[in-house]
């Protein structure tokens, strides 16, 4: 199932005429995961054609205002619009306390179910959200003394494609037996022969991976999240001319983001969290492409489509006999 990654806000610290405060949506099967929620995110969701009612989970990287001050308002809107479906909030240490300080946004007082996951201050992270089809992993980043985390959305590997012709050749009757094989269960043919899934299924099909790594120096956590990602959104606050400033403030340059993408084996790189000091981000894009050609400045409201069919292995026959 394809995934759309939609940058809603790609500015650093303050909005500009062209860029808005940090937020990024991942849409799959009409359901939305929201990463960061700076001021104005509700407007950006509307402009992107994304309904707040379809948000299943919200992930906040850290408690700097440009990444989280839109969250109380979004929760209040959900309350006012009589939301009934549950929502999961994955927050850094202190996140729940911040919401409790805002009337109308305290999770325990909202009329819809809210599941709060507060990251361990010691940085013990891992899988913070999962369904039958996807998992979201969090890792600690390096944003000076501020606790910050990045996220990796990964579809689960799916069984290989079912070969009905081979199943018939092995004596499997059409009907429920086909379904059992596709679900990974062996079946017995009318003549008593056991047919196993590996005899009629192609190689396993990997799902797509998107990583959100922002407000960080280059670090081990960010590289791990970016490992073989189909799409990596990475902090590129500064160009090379302010590399020292990037290190001082706990950010990355565009070239450093590209180096992370290259070393991690990512497929595509989106440069985000861009400083307002660069009205034209073309120099940052050029610097990144000199290291990693598949880099580009993130375009707000554009849908970056990730299709798992593009990753499917060639149908070279049954994967095994088990």
Swiss-Prot record:
Reported cofactor(s): Zn(2+)
Chain spans, region Disordered: 300-322
Function: Zinc phosphodiesterase, which displays some tRNA 3'-processing endonuclease activity. Probably involved in tRNA maturation, by removing a 3'-trailer from precursor tRNA.
Subunit structure: Homodimer.
Binding site for Zn(2+) 2: 66-67, 215, 273
Keywords: Endonuclease, Hydrolase, Metal-binding, Nuclease, tRNA processing, Zinc
SUPFAM superfamilies: Metallo-hydrolase/oxidoreductase (SSF56281)
Family in the record: Belongs to the RNase Z family.
Enzyme class: hydrolase
Keyword Transmembrane: no
NCBIfam families, A to Z: PRK00055.1-3 (NF000801), RNase_Z (TIGR02651)
Protein name listed in UniProt: Ribonuclease Z
EC number(s) from the headed UniProt entry: 3.1.26.11
Cofactor: how and how many bound: Binds 2 Zn(2+) ions.
Binding-site positions, Zn(2+) 1: 62, 64, 143, 215
Location of the active site: 66 (proton acceptor)
Reactions it catalyzes: Endonucleolytic cleavage of RNA, removing extra 3' nucleotides from tRNA precursor, generating 3' termini of tRNAs. A 3'-hydroxy group is left at the tRNA terminus and a 5'-phosphoryl group is left at the trailer molecule
Compositionally biased region (Basic and acidic residues): 300-314
Gene: rnz
Pfam families in the record: Lactamase_B, Lactamase_B_2
PANTHER family from the UniProt entry: ZINC PHOSPHODIESTERASE ELAC PROTEIN 1 (PTHR46018:SF2)
A GO term for molecular function: zinc ion binding
């Amino acid at each position: 199932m394809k995934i759309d990654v939609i940058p809603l806000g790609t500015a650093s610290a303050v909005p500009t005429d062209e860029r808005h405060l940090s937020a990024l949506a991942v849409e799959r099967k009409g359901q939305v995961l929201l990463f960061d929620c700076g001021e104005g995110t509700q407007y950006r969701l509307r402009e992107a054609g994304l309904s707040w009612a379809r948000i299943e989970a919200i992930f906040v990287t850290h408690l700097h205002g440009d990444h989280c001050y839109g969250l109380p308002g979004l929760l209040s809107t959900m309350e006012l619009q009589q939301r009934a479906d549950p929502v999961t909030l994955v927050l850094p240490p202190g996140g729940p306390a911040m919401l409790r300080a805002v009337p109308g946004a305290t999770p325990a007082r909202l009329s819809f179910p809210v599941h709060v996951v507060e990251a361990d201050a010691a940085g013990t992270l891992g899988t913070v959200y999962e369904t039958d089809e996807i998992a979201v992993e969090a890792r600690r980043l390096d944003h000076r003394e501020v606790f910050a985390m990045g996220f990796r959305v990964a579809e689960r590997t799916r069984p290989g494609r079912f070969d009905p012709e081979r199943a018939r050749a092995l004596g499997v009757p059409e009907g429920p037996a086909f379904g059992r094989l596709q679900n990974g269960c062996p079946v017995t043919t009318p003549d008593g022969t056991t047919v196993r899934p590996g005899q009629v299924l192609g190689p396993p099909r990997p799902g797509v991976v998107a990583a959100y790594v922002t407000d960080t120096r280059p670090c081990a956590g960010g590289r791990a999240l970016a490992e073989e990602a189909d799409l990596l959104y990475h902090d590129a606050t500064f160009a090379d001319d302010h590399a020292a400033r990037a290190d001082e403030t706990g950010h990355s340059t565009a070239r450093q983001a590209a180096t992370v993408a290259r070393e991690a084996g990512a497929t595509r790189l989106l440069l985000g969290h861009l400083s307002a000091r660069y009205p034209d981000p073309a120099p940052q894009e050029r610097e990144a492409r000199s290291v990693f050609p598949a880099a580009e400045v993130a375009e707000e409201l554009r849908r970056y489509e990730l299709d798992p069919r593009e990753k499917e292995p060639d149908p070279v026959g049954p994967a095994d006999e088990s």
